[in-house]
Each structure stands twice: as C-alpha cells, then as structure tokens.
Amino acid sequence: MSSQVSNFPASIMKTNDIPDVKRSLANFHPNIWKEHFLSFTFDDALKIDEGMKERTEKLKEEIRMMMIAYVENQLIKLNLVDSIQRLGVSYHFEDEVDEFLEHIYVSYNNSLLLSNKNSNGEDLHITALLFRLLRQQGYRISCDIFLKFMDDNGKFKESLVEDERGLLSLYEASHMMGHGEALLEEALEFTTTHLQTYIHRYSNINPSFASEVSNALKLPIRKSVPRIKAREYLEIYQQHPSHNETLLEFSKLDFNILQKLHQKELSEICRWWKDLDVPTKFPFARDRIVECYFWTLGAYFEPQYSVGRKMLTKVIAIASILDDIYDAYGTFEELQVLTPAIQRWDRSMVHTLPLYMKPFYVAMLELYEEIGKEIDKDQNSLHLQVAIGGIKRLSESYFEEAKWLNKEYKPSFKEYMELALKTTGYTMLISISFLGLGDHIVTNEVLQWLSNGPQIIKASTIICRLMDDIASHKFEQEREHVASAVECYMKQYDCSEEEACIELHKEVVDAWKDTNEAFYRPFNVPVPVLMRVLNFSRVINLLYLDEDGYTNAKSGTKFLIKSLLVDPLPC
C-alpha cells in the first residue's frame, strides 16, 4: 500500500506544521488495556497481609533447609533444584543452588559425567537433567556423556522412544548446545520428532504430561521468559504425583506477592504515560505502555530491580515512539531536523522542531534527567553518558534507514544487517537494563566490556532483528518501508520467501549457540549482566515466535500479560 494522506481528526492535525503532508501511516490498533492498571492503588499493595509474609518466610526457610541438608540420593536434590528454578523462585536460593551444583560438578566430573559404565548414568533423564543444570550454571560439560545412549551407527537408540520423560529432558538439554556439537543437534532432531508423535498419540491418556511436552516444544526452558515459564509450570507441577507441597505453596505465594509489586509499578508507569497524553499528541504511534512493561518483566522480574524496571519501561516506551516517528510518520525533511536535535541534546533545540515533535523531545530529555537522578547524583557520570549515547546512536541509525527509503535504495543482505542490528535498539535497551542492577554490579569495567561489542549482545541483536523481520515483514511492506532481512535475502540469493526464512532461522540458531557459549566459565562479567542479555533474547523469542506480538498485541500477548499482571494464582 502506498503512502496515504493522514486522516487524523482536525484537532489532532493542528499539532503538525504541514497538516496536508502525505505520510506512510501504519494504522496501529489502539491501547487494548485503556486505564485498567491506573485503578491500582497503594492500598491494593497492602493487601499482602503480615500473615502471608510470615508464612512465606517460614516456607522459604524450610526449603533452604532442604537445600543444605545431606541427601544420599542426589537425584532428589537435583530435581528439587530444577523445580526451584522452573517455578521462578531460585532468586531466593542462589547461594544454596550455586554450592550444590558446584559440589555436583566436582563430585561427578570424573564418574557419572565421563564414565559409560556407571549404572546411574544409564538413566537418560538423570544424565540430561544433570547436563542441563550444570551448563546453565556455566560448567562446560562435554556432550559426550550422551554417547552411551547411541548405537553403533551414531544414532540414538530406538529403545529410548519408550522413555518419554527421558526424551523431554534430553530435548531441554539439547538447547544448551554450542557450536560444533553435532551430537546435541542430533538429540534435538531425535527428541523433537518423537515428542511430537507422543502428543498426537497420548494427549488423552496423560494430558498433564502432554501439555508439558507441548509447551516445551513451543518454548524450551533455555529460550523461555522465566516469569512466563514459572506461571505455566506452576499449573503442571501441582499435578505431579511427587511434587513438593512446601515448594508449591511457597511458589504460589511468592508469585502473588511479586504480582502485587509489579501491578504497583505498572500503575505508576501508566500515570506517567497518561500525563504524556500519547493518544492525542502522538496518535500515529503504538500506544503500548503495558506491553513495554511486560517486555521489561522479561528482562528482570525480581523485587530488587524495581527501580530498574521503571526506568527501562519508560525508555522502551520513548524509543517506541521514536521508532514510529522515523518509521511510520515523520517526513524525511522533518527527520533531517530531529536527528541533529537529538545529537545536540539541548532543550533549546525544541524551537527547531515541528510542533508534534516538541512534546516528544521534551519528554525524552526529562526522562533521561530522571534516570540520571536515579543512578547517580552526578549528572555527568559515565553511566548516564552511556545511556544518552545509546539513544543518540539509535536515532542516527534510524535516519540512515530513512535515507535508504528516501532514495528507494535496496541494500544487499550484508549491508542491511550491518545497519539493521543497530536499528533494533537492543544494544541501547540492554545497556539501560544494566543501570538497574546497581553500581556494585555494573562497574566501569562492565561498561567497557559493553563498549567493545561483546558477542552475546551481537547475538541478541541478531535474534531480535531476524525474528522481528520474519514475523513482521509482510505487514511492513504494505506501506512505504525499507526492505526487511527477508526481502534483502530473497533479492541477493534469488530465492523464495520460504527459503529465505529457513536460512534466516539458521542464523538465529547460531546466535543462540553464541549466547550459550558466553555463559561458559570463567565469566567475563557478572552473571546478572549476562542474564539480562539472555532474557532480552528470550523476550524476542516469545513475542515474535508466531507474529509481531508487540505491534499486534490483541491476542497472544494479551493472554500472556493477563496471566502475569491480572490473574493471581489460587493458593
């Protein structure tokens, strides 16, 4: 669809200097949540009574004692650790989990892990669970431990097909693969094939396990947003005959307590958003403040990161409007004025901007002033410079893309990717998320590491760009829009859309391998820093799995948000 004349109401069009200019409108759907979260008050937060808090602390201590108690059968504790992590409460027991898995690594490194004769090692579930938990913890365990489950032809034994739990554990373990691990690629193909068959054959016989398998095939643990996976797994875990009642009760209480905190944060953010009056001042932009907060929850949900969540959500929201100004509304001439104004970063530049850009520019500057006050009393701190530098570079990248569109330039795939990795905004958003971790974690050394363009961040931007383009390129090409990775790949390699998407997906798979390898010990930066990057990749994997769930937030994304921010768990 070609450019169309803006058809906004006259009252809104008065905000523009040239009301009859032709603009390439995207016609995004309005905010589906309206003022739902504005109704949350501080009194609602107080509904977590003292009795609930006391009960939670008592249960927490009981679980901690389970973790430090001696257990002769280590499989019991392995399953406990796995459940603690999958239920989203491991942040309460980080030291205990670290100590236990280090003990497991040291104790079993020369026995269970490397011996093909150890009888305990013949259990596929145990071996796969051990492998995944240790790799998640940064221990580079060789995938050769799975050789015992392969036949003389280098294929997994067909007898394993009867071990559904073992297959599921191996499937989850295979997603920890790095480069050159053909055995894990074989494991992924083998388990995926047979687990898909299991769902079709036995969904009525064992619906709970079939549901667990179905969820895993769609979103394996390694690529899942922790808070979403916890909500999902809580319903499955309570149906396990061997579930730990103490852990189950604690996890439900913890989920609901955190949900109240998240609702309070979102209410504050929605009030800030309402004061910006986005529907009136920026009617061309995606009104997605609740979705922005959901994105942030994917990056970090733990209570100690409350300030960081509020900062990051606001930056995502401002960056989203900026994206829509460059991508869906601003004329090339207007963008020629906005870009240098952002580079100057000076309130006096407001007078140079078109009327509709003025409130955006002021809001952006005020937001970063607020961030500066939050992270450091010294407004000239390196942390603040990094934050401001990120959005400056993002606007420059957006403008380079606008130049392509203005010239009707069709880049090669390589040329497109060099710029498109910058226009994801992911490097900027990841750096903002770091600021919410605190100076004790994000030191100047970490900021230096960030400035060097580490492979894990590049991998996250690749995942973001390619999954975004695969999901949204058809919608974007309905209007004047720069070519996506799909179109550029099709043109350069003279292939079909389906073939292009298959090849781009392979690059996403390689980016996940880069991500996994960044978690091998010794760590270059603190683990909380690496976890933010991993979680940003997980959010993209969730929101863009089937469609652009940020732009089109009326179906799947709405359900996910409802599960985390509206519906409490029955206790």
UniProtKB/Swiss-Prot annotation:
Family from the record: Belongs to the terpene synthase family. Tpsa subfamily.
Class of enzymatic activity (EC top level): lyase
Name this protein carries in UniProt: (+)-gamma-cadinene synthase
Keywords assigned: Cytoplasm, Lyase, Magnesium, Metal-binding
Pathway connected to this protein: Secondary metabolite biosynthesis; terpenoid biosynthesis
Domain of life the protein comes from: Eukaryota
PANTHER family: (-)-GERMACRENE D SYNTHASE (PTHR31225:SF221), OS04G0344100 PROTEIN-RELATED (PTHR31225)
Reactions accelerated catalytically: (2E,6E)-farnesyl diphosphate = (+)-gamma-cadinene + diphosphate; (2E,6E)-farnesyl diphosphate = (1S,8aR)-delta-cadinene + diphosphate
Tissue-level expression: Expressed in the rind tissues of ripe fruits.
Compartments in which it is found: Cytoplasm
Binding site for Mg(2+) 2: D323, D327
Motif DDXXD motif boundaries: 323-327
A UniProt-annotated Pfam family: Terpene_synth
A molecular function (GO) term: sesquiterpene synthase activity
Domain notes: The Asp-Asp-Xaa-Xaa-Asp/Glu (DDXXD/E) motif is important for the catalytic activity, presumably through binding to Mg(2+).
Record InterPro entries: Isoprenoid_synthase_dom_sf, Terpene_cyclase-like_1_C, Terpene_cyclase_plant_C1, Terpene_synth_N, Terpene_synth_N_sf, Terpene_synthase-like, Terpene_synthase_metal-bd, Terpenoid_cyclase/PrenylTrfase
Main location: cytoplasm
GO process annotations (BP): diterpenoid biosynthetic process; farnesyl diphosphate metabolic process; sesquiterpene biosynthetic process
Residues the record lists as binding Mg(2+) 1: D323, D327
